Amino acid sequence: MGQVYWSWEAEVKPGELENFKDNVVRDWNETAAKDCNTLINQWVIDEGGSSVKVYQRFTSAKHALAQFADNPGWEKLDDYLEPSAMFVCGDYGNELDFLREHGAVFMQDL
């Protein structure tokens, strides 16, 4: 099974940027850095400070799925953000199908 990667986008709730950075991003990045199956983990923010995006790449769909249990940051996102988009790419198989119910778009290579 090959690598899986995604981008997840959201709008920052008014007044919540610093709380988001303090209560999610720091711990999220530490969790990802310790996981040998997380190949890429990068949070970015637009210049206006109102939209964020995380890029992640994993060794497999199985390990991507494990992030939802292993990374407590996923449970906190709704406290600070309004999700707007998710794009899933790579060898995702069926393991990540539950993300479709949450609006994820599954992309294929051209």
Q: Where in this protein do the model-derived segments appear?
A:
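Short S/T/G/P-rich N-terminal loop/turn motif that feeds into the first structured element of a domain
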Residues: 1-52, 59-70, 79-110
